[in-house]
Amino acid sequence: MAAYLFTCSILQTLSEAGKIEIAEDKLLHYLGELPGTPNGPVQLLENICTILEGQGRATHGNVIRHVLNIVVTEQELGGLGISGKSWEEVDEHTLHEIKFLTDAWLTAAESRAAARHLPQPLKQQDTRRLPMNLAEKILAHHAFSVPRRERVVAGDLLRVSIDWVIASELSWVGMKHSVTSLDMKPSAWRNDRFWLSGDHTVDPRTYHDKRVQALIKGLESAKRDLKMTENQGSNYTIMHTEFVRERAEPGMLVLGSDSHTCSAGAVSALAIGLGAGDVMAGLATGETWFKVPECIRINFTGQPAWYIGGKDVILSVLKQLKRNTYAAERIVEFGGAGAKLLSCDARFAISNMCTVRDPNDRPELKPTADDRSTSRNLVLLQAFLFPTVSLNRLSIAAGARYEGASYASTFEIDLGEVEPFIAIYPSPDQVCPVAERTGMRFDGCFIGACTTTEEDLVLAALVLEAGLKRGLTLEKGKRIVVPGSLPIVKNLRALGLLDIYKACGYEQPAPGCSLCLGIGADVAEAGSQWLSSQNRNFQNRMGRGAVGHICSAATVAASSFNMTLTDPCDLLNDVSETTFKEYLARCKVARGGSESKLAGGKQANNVQYIEPCLLGENARSAEGEVPALEAAAVSLDDARLGSINSRIYKLDDYVDTDALPQIIPAPACVGSPTDEMLGSHCFELTNPDFRDYVRSGHRVIVGGRAFGCGSSREEAPRALKGLGVQCVIARSFAFIFGRNMPNIGMLAIVLTDEAFYKAAQQGENIEVDVEGRVVHVAGQTFPFSLDDMELQLIRNRGLAASYQKLGSKVFAALCQKPAPLPISALADATLAQGGSIGRQMDW
């Protein structure tokens, strides 16, 4: 009976989702009632594939065959794992999942056909084309139109299509809130291009918790409501890990509601973390907007020691360049002869930590070209690029083809000089050699987080094995290892490396963020000292009052015997480089042994270098549409905004979303809090009087440099809004925060005039004339710059409200008016006056 009912439901799904009709007389064959017919769901799908292919329905046949591949793939590799099972051996839940997958992937075929297709790339360079760096090429190729045929340049406002959206269970709450708060339902322009993973707070040890149950329910609801093909469920993978390993491709444009989205730069994708509402609009429309950023180039030279991985390389970069200096709000493009020697895992670790930010340290590394950014102190832009291989399966030009491209600065890093480093609490760029700090004592050692890759985990296990063979004893302390995904867990188990971790006293929770975020099942105790291979070591990151220092997994492993900082090089002398490489090769074979879960995915054997196609305002895209902005078809709110009259609340530089001074504590973001609920926790750890001041009329904040640095959490500006803050004025804003403010309908103003900050004291009366773009304080008037797009977003009460009014045409409407002054001109004018560029360089 189960077989009959399931077969009927599958045939109904084929009819409704794929418009596929199969003759009634075929039904008995599916049920195994004809002699010699095998029995079970797998055989049913096989037979359907055969019939569809026989009918000439190759596309639909490929879809069902892809579903079949998922059905037989092991559960640890993301499948259902029912290969060879009979009807009696497959439970009802699994049958329901097979039906869902069939429906979802048939829907994906339709949504893929309906979505905008990028124009065909050029097989050879246009002789009229001027050189562009990789980020410019990717943005130009994804643009609906570009302002000139020769190239795009920093400051150009582009309406672009996107390839992927990624989110966690925690950021999905904010994404969903941005539309449900306006009585709209979440939607996706393509149901096969939304990667959602439960990793930040969900954990099998806390599945019973009501807040965790609500998050898990949110994941499941998103899967069903959007017919998601890429919903990873809970604790299958940290959101970035398997996305980069399985989905991201060179030349793609990826949006994520997480600041470490830039991890996909490891495979030459342009991947950028944004706020939840911003990403939700991208998910609904398949579009967004950017102002083309400036780019710096870091050339790797020399050859690293065989045991040097991405973590030590990026710590070396941070040590020399520092944060918020040359790379502030810019794309970072890595290349050079040394880049070829870095594995994809090493590139992942480097990319992952390109999102860190903060203090005033001056850069020690001298640029090899003229630099215009020494006065900046802003957030490092969330993107990272190695100029290599394909643009959506066709290769984008690399190496010599970037000659003549525009870079704000160029640097060189000698990989031969990289050694084991440690970043001292509480800043990822307070870096020094491990050898200079040996002897530091720890209460705990943590190997994990998305930045800790498969090869890092393999090498750390071999270091532990070397220590065991030497007879090293384990001193008292807490030890935790958290691989980034179940496929990595499977590989480590097959190599016998999980047993080594167990022998060394390491707890092994399910894949997730764990101590790197410190708000789930694993929270470091107040006052405890930790050595960790995670990516951030800010105050309260691992747990309130806990202290964390970050380094490579190999260094953590070597230090975990006596819980004292130990240079891993001694134990690495006992590790065979050959064995290490053999283990990595076995991991690679295991990964290559199963087909890609992405339907239609193909491995390119021959690299073909191509150039992006630049569409002019009247050019046609691949499906023949005219991409010119539909100015006549959309209307915007022209209502004028009144002035803001308030008193000032004064804050300093580097007001943070994550670290201290902290706008909103991470635990307050869990669940589905309203703006008002978030506001009740605003600055509660560092400025407990802040909320009373705002309620008494101090509704304009005056801050300093890099206001809102930290993560992509949109809850930070929402908390300010929920409390009643009307405007934030600062010398500069962190990229994501500065973009989040107008997206939720709030005013963020950059002022660099020193006279303003002398006049704008705590409690001083202030008037902000939004339409006139001037601020009045202490009898003085200060003009400010505000893009037409930002002004329109504020008039419309934010991006979500704009989408509610304009629907899929929202970005066409918002992008129809150019910025009043090219951003490059703003930068030149500001620098000429000796000021800081600030958020005028946002894109």
Curated annotation (Swiss-Prot):
GO terms under biological process: L-amino acid biosynthetic process; proteinogenic amino acid biosynthetic process
Family from the record: Belongs to the aconitase/IPM isomerase family.
Transmembrane intervals: none
Enzyme class name: lyase
InterPro entries in alphabetical order: Acnase/IPM_dHydase_lsu_aba_1/3, Acoase/IPM_deHydtase_lsu_aba, Aconitase/3IPM_dehydase_swvl, Aconitase_4Fe-4S_BS, Aconitase_4Fe-4S_dom, AconitaseA/IPMdHydase_ssu_swvl, IPM_dehydratase_rel_enz, IPMI_Swivel
Pfam families: Aconitase, Aconitase_C
Miscellaneous information on this protein: Gene clusters encoding host-selective toxins (HSTs) are localized on conditionally dispensable chromosomes (CDCs), also called supernumerary chromosomes, where they are present in multiple copies. The CDCs are not essential for saprophytic growth but controls host-selective pathogenicity.
Keyword Iron-sulfur: yes
Superkingdom of origin organism: Eukaryota
Record key words, sorted: Iron, Iron-sulfur, Lyase, Metal-binding, Virulence
Binding-site list for [4Fe-4S] cluster: C450, C513, C516
Molecular function terms from GO: hydro-lyase activity; iron-sulfur cluster binding; metal ion binding
Entry function: Aconitase; part of the gene clusters that mediate the biosynthesis of AM-toxins, host-selective toxins (HSTs) causing Alternaria blotch on apple, a worldwide distributed disease. AM-toxins are cyclic depsipeptides containing the 3 residues 2-hydroxy-isovaleric acid (2-HIV), dehydroalanine, L-alanine which are common for all 3 AM-toxins I to III. The fourth precursor is L-alpha-amino-methoxyphenyl-valeric acid (L-Amv) for AM-toxin I, L-alpha-amino-phenyl-valeric acid (L-Apv) for AM-toxin II, and L-alpha-amino-hydroxyphenyl-valeric acid (L-Ahv) for AM-toxin III.
Annotated gene: AMT8-2
Organism classification: Eukaryota, Fungi, Dikarya, Ascomycota, Pezizomycotina
Protein name: Aconitase AMT8-2
Protein's pathway: Mycotoxin biosynthesis
Enzyme Commission identifier(s): 4.2.1.-
Ligand binding (substrate): D258, S259, H260, R536, R541, S712, R713
